[in-house]
UniProtKB/Swiss-Prot annotation:
Residues 1280-1289 have a biased composition (Polar residues). Component of N-methyl-D-aspartate (NMDA) receptors (NMDARs) that function as heterotetrameric, ligand-gated cation channels with high calcium permeability and voltage-dependent block by Mg(2+). Participates in synaptic plasticity for learning and memory formation by contributing to the long-term depression (LTD) of hippocampus membrane currents. Channel activation requires binding of the neurotransmitter L-glutamate to the GluN2 subunit, glycine or D-serine binding to the GluN1 subunit, plus membrane depolarization to eliminate channel inhibition by Mg(2+). Residues 1269-1278 have a biased composition (Low complexity). GO terms for cellular component: cytoskeleton; dendrite; late endosome; lysosome; NMDA selective glutamate receptor complex; plasma membrane; postsynaptic density; postsynaptic density membrane. This is Glutamate receptor ionotropic, NMDA 2B. It comes from the Eukaryota. The record marks N615 as: Functional determinant of NMDA receptors. Residues 604-623 are annotated as: Pore-forming. It is found in: Cell membrane; Postsynaptic cell membrane; Cell projection, Dendrite; Late endosome. It comes from Canis lupus familiaris (Dog). Residues 1074-1097, 1162-1194, 1269-1302 are annotated as: Disordered. Disulfide bonds join C86-C321, C429-C456, C436-C457, C746-C801.
Length: 1485
């Protein structure tokens, strides 16, 4: 019994109680902490909905669980509210309160703020009076409101006004707390805004004074603005609206905007509130009371959970409202920081420092005609979204006065209405634009999305609307039409702008609205403010430039007149004036002189005028006569104007012409039958407009065809035109003209420069039977009367393509632009080719018959051509000599040929120095046939085999066998070469002299066809003068196979035979050529030195000077001749012109360098010269000559080379001018084409120096010692040329040295150093032409000690020696100046080979020496080798001795012998070209 008693002892029960308490505490510690929240609802709130909201398991994720106490109250007095909250704190241990009421008493918020500040308990006012604006809260209060602050509501009110462009407003407020914040916010916003706000009045009403309505009425009467902002309580607002209604401020035209404080409970609307009142309110529709309660609980719970997570505790519940510990204050302040920043379910539920929501859900409500609050807008995320794009004007139904604020619809169509976006900075429209709303039509649109977007409109119609509204005094709201375009009746219902007016949604329709009969039945139209109609727009297409575009700057008449004036009038006039001028070019004909002198022909006149027209720097011959000069000056003035006009207009015609489709009208074939064209013509318009209606009513087929090409808008149509998808666009003319004027690149044009079909106009559509029509018509007519309509048209309707010229863009001209010029050149080339072929056919086949050769009589065509030739070239043809001198008579009349031959022989016998040779003319006369220059009748005599004549034996008859040779020669002459009949070089302005270029000096020109066109290909075995006569019997018809001159020397009388450039404008000095000789001698020297261009010098003057020089006598009486076999000499000459294939052309050779040994050997050789007939034994073949060459006395021109030099050069390829060996030419080439390398030069010599390189010709060696004597082989003849020490010294002294450039002023001061070469005889007439004191006054005087022409026995070598080396002789110093080195030296005297080219200050001569392969080397002297040549005396009479130069003999294939034994230094700056002397180097350099 005892143990049982112990089990049931009191200690046992105590242990069990302790364990139970411990278990309960353990379980309590495991559950999350909770916070007590009281939800107090005042009034008839939906408690069931609230209970469901907070019982949902929405807070399980939080670390603190809310413990909600739901309390319902009916009393709203302060005592009841305070008592109930304090009881809950003490009984339920609550830690937060969520308060909601259904009253409009803002005092509840003040009571709640007081309780929160005293108890440090967070209280949330979520609805009713508890959420109304409370301006000044206690600093220690934790009272938060679900509503916007005063500043937030003020900003929303300004946004509403900005949305509808209500910029003029006033403010009315009472002394309710927060009014200052409201006014300050408004002022600060409008001051810092880009919008042009205008705050007219700010009224502060004192509602505490009980003095009746008089004071408030007087203050409200000051208001004139249509928009009024009111800040007060709901009760105060009721009284203010009552007074405002009495003064007429609540009627139509006035809009009141109030905050949520005034609206209060939306379920109760005071009767004093005017219809159309706008309020900013908390969202009661989308954010109801259950959602607010739930968010209130979540805010307190989330803040406590965040505090627990960071600080591990939550505020302790307060047991009483009357005592507050410091620990409680600390915890409450900490919880307050978490309440401000709360985010729940992704929504920002934060509060500001003032206790208002940072992102409240606000709505804009409107008191409609049913006296109910209608939500018309929403404020969300700082953006306003309104329901109405045009604010509906609400007015009481009792008011029947007409509205002066109109709703106007428009349509975007530039330039009449242009729509732009608002300014991104201010969000408003800029100046000169009008706000317009664009409705958004979307099937998926929700209520939260706005029904429109704000735009800005401007344009021609908008400016007219602004002026009309100002004149008629009405305001308007503008919006853009969305259901259609201008207006079309579909199924009995109108759409577009007409439909808006018909349905009375808009009072007016302004835009590009065409007036037509169908529309006029349903609406009224104003008078048209612009004329329009139907027009057609097309696109320009790039065309092509006409090939004759370069001729289009002038018409065909102008071109014809220009050429007529040039060829017929002006050129003939200049020619006639010059021909009959006493000082003209043809004065020699008037003086009775010999015809053939220089003349100014019609061809030269045409060439002169042509060059002046086109500014070509061509060589022309200017007239001398005063009358002709005046005529040319006038023509030059005409040429300037002509060319300037052509150049100025050329660019415009070279631009590609653009093609535009031409359409005559809507009845054009392209519109009525578009399929007849390929491709079919495509056109369209914009549907639902007056243009489509007009086409549909009048052209049914056209309307049916264009349906597939219709465009959605004007912009789409323009793009289709540019891309080629559309050929034509039919639309209103006013719109198309504007688009064409503003098109980029001006590619779009309207046909006929804006041609209009079916003319009509644009008008303003007004509701039917409206009282505004008359006032609008008068306003439009007033705009026309004041000229403002024209200003608007110039501003909006005139484009850059209409008003301004397009800027010409710089661009490159392609081949299409210049095609015509190239076509012209191609045609000219083809015509030239045809002319070339015809010329050759006529020349080689038909001209002989026309010349009378076939019939033996001069033909009529020939006579006419000679007459024309005489007229053009100024050559007089004597009637008595025409038959005698004609080529036909020369070819067919044997008697005349013999007479002409004898006359030529006589002239040659009387002249010495033929072609510059020191021999007598008789030395050239031989038995072979000769050719008379029958073209120019200049009595020039040339051998038929083109050889110089080797003197026959002394006993031979001088003219043996001449008669038979002439008969044989002229009888068998075949006329196949024009050069037989005409001397190209001396075509018509040279006297008939033996010194002409057709004489023998032309045969050795490097450019002569016998040396260049068909050079002889020499066989390995040299020629032998002892060939059988059968070898020469085949040469009787040789004269028709070669020409004496190449085309290079084709005759033009401007080609002066001197080394002056024909195009040079420099001058040379002359003595006066004409006039009395006595008078000329009295004149001063400088007065006699007339200046004239080189191209204007008389050809006769030069030829007479040249002729005088060539008549110079031999130098000494010991002049000797060396005769060779006549037959061999003839063979040698014939070989020069024998046509050979594969024979190279001759090259230019520089023979400037002269050896010292040349003069020395020359002097030594001349000591033992043989007699005239002694050298015939030397023509025999020697036994040691492998090739049949007989050793003999060397010719006088082979005097300066040693045997060693010759042996070295005969076996290899060496430079012509220096001893450099050419390694790039093989011996094989030498054997095959030996004639080509005879004048080959090295690169250094080719590149050596230019014309002005003075040191180039001064590079000659000066050797004071004479050449060492050389051994003479035993088989060589003993004849040597005599040489004296005196001559050697003289040669050193006068050896050719290059002088520097002399100016003209130094000529007179130069001392006379050497005597000039005097002619044998000079006529007094010619001698008088040279003035005393001029540089050429003593040119024809014979120096002292000069031998006459009497002695023919002196050797050529001695003569040549004296020519150069005799101090008293006339040797010339080589100078690069045009002017002479001495006053007695004439630079214009043609020397030997004057037709040859000038290379670096010296003449180049082209003579070749035959290659001797394996020649005997027994004699070291070069004279022994040269003696074996059969052609040593070939150039005996042709080479003047005054040029001590190395020569290549004949047309043989051996290399030429250089004068300089040292290789010439390569001058890299030289180009190696051949230069002609300029008229004055000094003035050029």
């Amino acid at each position: 019994m005892k143990p049982r008693a112990e089990c049931c002892s009191p200690k046992f029960w105590l242990v069990l109680a302790v364990l139970a308490v411990s278990g309960s505490r353990a379980r309590s510690q495991k559950s999350p902490p909770s916070i007590g929240i009281a939800v107090i609802l005042v009034g008839t709130s939906d408690e069931v909905a609230i209970k469901d909201a907070h019982e949902k398991d929405d807070f399980h994720h939080l670390s603190v669980v809310p413990r909600v106490e739901l309390v319902a109250m009916n009393e709203t007095d302060p005592k009841s509210i305070i008592t109930r909250i304090c009881d809950l704190m003490s009984d339920r241990k609550i830690q937060g309160v969520v308060f909601a009421d259904d009253t409009d008493q803002e005092a509840i918020a003040q009571i709640l703020d007081f309780i929160s500040a005293q108890t440090l308990t967070p209280i949330l006012g979520i609805h009713g009076g508890s959420s109304m604006i409370m301006a000044d809260k206690d600093e220690s209060s934790m009272f938060f409101q679900f509503g916007p602050s005063i500043e937030q509501q003020a900003s929303v009110m300004l946004n509403i006004m900005e949305e509808y462009d209500w910029y003029i407003f006033s403010i009315v407020t009472t002394y309710f707390p927060g009014y200052q914040d409201f006014v300050n916010k408004i002022r600060s916003t409008i001051e810092n805004s880009f919008v042009g706000w205008e705050l007219e009045e700010v009224l502060l009403l004192d509602m505490s004074l009980d003095d009746g309505d008089s004071k408030i009425q007087n203050q409200l009467k000051k208001l004139q603005s249509p928009i009024i902002l009111l800040y007060c309580t709901k009760e105060e607002a009721t009284y203010i609206f009552e007074v405002a209604n009495s003064v007429g401020l609540t009627g139509y035209g006035y809009t009141w905007i109030v905050p949520s404080l005034v609206a209060g409970d939306t379920d109760t609307v005071p009767s004093e509130f005017p219809t159309g009142l706008i309020s900013v309110s908390y969202d009661e529709w989308d954010y109801g009371l259950p959602a607010r309660v739930r968010d209130g609980i979540a805010i307190i719970t989330t803040a406590a959970s965040d505090m627990l997570s960071e600080h591990s505790f939550i505020p302790e519940p307060k047991s009483s409202c009357y005592n507050t510990h410091e620990k409680r204050i600390y915890q409450s302040n900490m919880l307050n920081r978490y309440l401000i920043n709360v985010t729940f379910e992704g929504r920002n539920l934060s509060f500001s420092e003032d206790g208002y929501q940072m992102h409240p859900k606000l709505v804009i409500i409107l008191l409609n005609k049913e006296r109910k609050w209608e939500r018309v807008g929403k404020w969300k995320d700082k953006s306003l979204q309104m329901k109405y794009y045009v604010w509906p004007r609400m007015c009481p139904e009792t008011e029947e006065q007409e509205d002066d604020h109109l709703s106007i619809v428009t349509l975007e169509e530039a330039p009449f209405v242009i729509v732009e976006s608002v300014d991104p900075l201010s969000g408003t429209c800029m100046r000169n634009t009008v706000p317009c709303q664009k409705r958004i039509v979307s099937e998926n649109k929700t209520d939260e999305e706005p029904g429109y977007i704000k735009k800005c409109c401007k344009g021609f119609c908008i400016d007219i609307l602004k002026k009309i509204s100002k004149s008629v005094k009405f305001t308007y709201d503008l919006y853009l039409v969305t259901n259609g375009k201008h207006g079309k009746k579909i199924n009995g219902t109108w759409n577009g702008m007409i439909g808006e007016v018909v349905m009375k949604r808009a009072y007016m329709a302004v835009g590009s609205l065409t007036i037509n009969e169908e529309r006029s039945e349903v609406v009224d139209f104003s008078v048209p403010f612009i004329e329009t109609g139907i027009s057609v727009m097309v696109s320009r297409s790039n065309g092509t430039v006409s090939p004759s575009a370069f001729l289009e700057p002038f018409s065909a008449d102008v071109w014809v007149m220009m050429f007529v004036m040039l060829l017929i009038v002006s050129a003939v006039a200049v020619f006639v004036f010059e021909y009959f001028s006493p000082v003209g070019y043809n004065r020699c004909l008037a003086d009775g002189r010999e015809p053939g002198g220089p003349s100014f022909t019609i061809g030269k006149a045409i060439w002169l005028l042509w060059g002046l027209v086109f500014n070509n720097s061509v060589p022309v011959q200017n007239p001398k006569g005063t009358t002709s000069k005046i005529m040319v000056s006038v023509w030059a003035f005409f040429a300037v104007i002509f060319l300037a006009s052509y150049t100025a207009n050329l660019a415009a015609f070279m631009i590609q012409e653009e093609y535009v489709d031409q359409v005559s009208g809507l009845s054009d074939k392209k519109f009525q039958r578009p399929n007849d064209f390929s491709p079919p013509f495509r056109f369209g318009t914009v549907p639902n407009g007056s243009t489509e209606r007009n086409i549909r009513n009048n052209y049914a087929e056209m309307h049916a065809y264009m349906g597939k090409f219709n465009q959605r808008g004007v912009d789409d149509a323009l793009l289709s035109l540019k891309t080629g998808k559309l050929d034509a666009f039919i639309y209103d003319a006013a719109v198309l003209n504007y688009m064409a004027g503003r098109d980029e690149g001006c590619k779009l044009v309207t046909i006929g420069s804006g041609k209009v079909f079916a003319s009509t106009g644009y008008g303003i559509a007004i509701q039917k039977d409206s009282g505004w029509k008359r006032q609008v018509d008068l306003a439009i007519l007033q705009l026309f009367g004041d000229g403002e309509m024209e200003e608007l048209e110039a501003l909006w309707l005139t484009g850059i393509c209409h008003n301004e010229k397009n800027e010409v863009m710089s661009s490159q001209l392609d081949i299409d632009n210049m095609a015509g010029v190239f076509y012209m050149l191609g045609a000219a080339m083809a015509l030239s080719l045809i002319t070339f072929i015809c010329e050759h056919l006529f020349y080689w086949q038909f001209r002989h018959c026309f010349m009378g050769v076939c019939s033996g009589k001069p033909g009529m065509v020939f006579s006419i051509s000679r007459g024309i030739y005489s007229c053009i070239h100024g050559v007089a043809i004597e009637e008595r000599q025409s038959v005698m001198n004609s080529p036909t008579a020369t070819m067919n009349n044997t008697h005349s040929n013999i007479l002409r031959l004898l006359r030529t022989a006589k002239n040659m016998a009387n002249l010495s120095g033929v072609n510059g040779s020191p021999q007598s003319a008789l030395d050239f006369i031989r038995r072979e046939s000769s050719v008379y220059d029958i073209s120019e009748h200049r009595r020039s005599f040339t051998h038929s085999d083109c050889k110089s004549y080797n003197n026959p034996p002394c006993e031979e008859n001088l003219f043996s066998d001449y008669i038979s040779e002439v008969e044989r020669t002229f009888g068998n002459l075949q006329l196949k070469d024009s050069n037989v009949y005409q001397d190209h070089y001396h075509h018509h302005h040279r006297p008939h002299s033996i010194g002409s270029a057709s004489s023998i000096d032309g045969l050795y020109d490097c450019d002569n066809p016998p040396f260049t066109t068909q050079p002889r290909s020499i066989s390995k075995k040299p020629l032998d003068l002892g060939l059988p006569s059968s070898k020469h019997s085949q040469l009787s018809d040789l004269y028709g196979k070669f020409s004496f001159k190449s085309d290079r020397y084709s005759g033009h009388d401007d080609l002066i035979r001197s080394d002056v450039s024909d195009i040079s404008t420099h001058t040379v000095t002359y003595g006066n050529i004409e006039g009395n000789a006595a008078k000329r001698r009295k004149q001063q020297y400088k007065d006699s030195l007339k200046k004239r261009p080189a191209s204007a010098k008389s050809r006769r003057e030069f030829d007479e000077i040249e002729l005088a020089y060539r008549r110079r006598p031999p130098r000494s009486p010991d002049h000797k001749r060396y005769f060779r076999d006549k037959e061999g000499l003839r063979d040698f000459y014939l070989d020069q012109f024998r046509t050979k294939e594969n024979s190279p052309h001759w090259e230019h050779v520089d023979l400037t360098d002269i050896y010292k040994e040349q003069s020395d050997d020359f002097k030594r050789d001349s000591v033992s010269g043989g007699g005239p007939c002694t050298n015939r034994s030397h023509l025999k073949h020697g036994a040691g000559d492998k090739h049949g060459v007989v050793s003999g006395v060397p010719a006088p021109w082979e005097k300066n080379l040693s045997n060693v030099d010759w042996e070295d050069r005969s076996g290899g390829n060496f430079c012509r001018s220096c001893p450099s060996k050419l390694h790039n030419y093989s011996t094989a080439v030498t054997g095959q084409n030996s004639g080509r390398q005879a004048c080959i030069r090295c690169e250094a010599c080719k590149k050596a120096g230019n014309l002005y390189d003075i040191s180039e010709d001064n590079s000659l060696q000066e050797l004071d010692q004479p050449a060492a004597p050389v051994a003479v082989p035993s088989n060589a003849p003993s004849t040597k040329y005599p040489q004296s020490p005196t001559n050697s010294k003289a040669q050193k002294k006068t050896r050719n040295k290059l002088r520097r450039q002399h100016s003209y002023d130094t000529f007179v001061d130069l001392q006379k150093e050497e005597a000039a070469l005097a002619p044998r005889s000079v006529s007094l007439k010619d001698k008088g032409r040279f003035l005393d004191g001029s540089p050429y006054a003593h040119m024809f005087e014979t120096p002292a000690g000069e031998s006459t022409f009497a002695n023919h026995e002196s050797s050529v070598a001695a003569a040549g020696h004296r020519h150069h080396n005799n101090p008293g002789g006339g040797g010339y110093m080589l100078s690069k100046s045009l002017y002479p080195d001495r006053v007695t030296q004439n630079p214009f005297i043609p020397t030997f080979g004057d037709d040859q080219c000038l290379l670096h200050g010296s003449k180049s001569y082209f003579f070749r020496q035959p290659t001797v392969a394996g020649a005997p080397k027994a004699r070291p002297d070069f004279r022994a080798l040269v003696t074996n040549k059969p052609v040593v005396s070939a150039l005996h009479g042709a080479v003047p001795g005054r040029f001590q130069k190395d020569i290549c003999i004949g047309n043989q294939s051996n290399p030429c012998v250089p004068n300089n034994k040292n290789p010439r230094a390569f001058n890299g700056s030289s180009n190696g070209h051949v230069y002609e002397k300029l008229s004055s180097i000094e003035s050029d350099v």
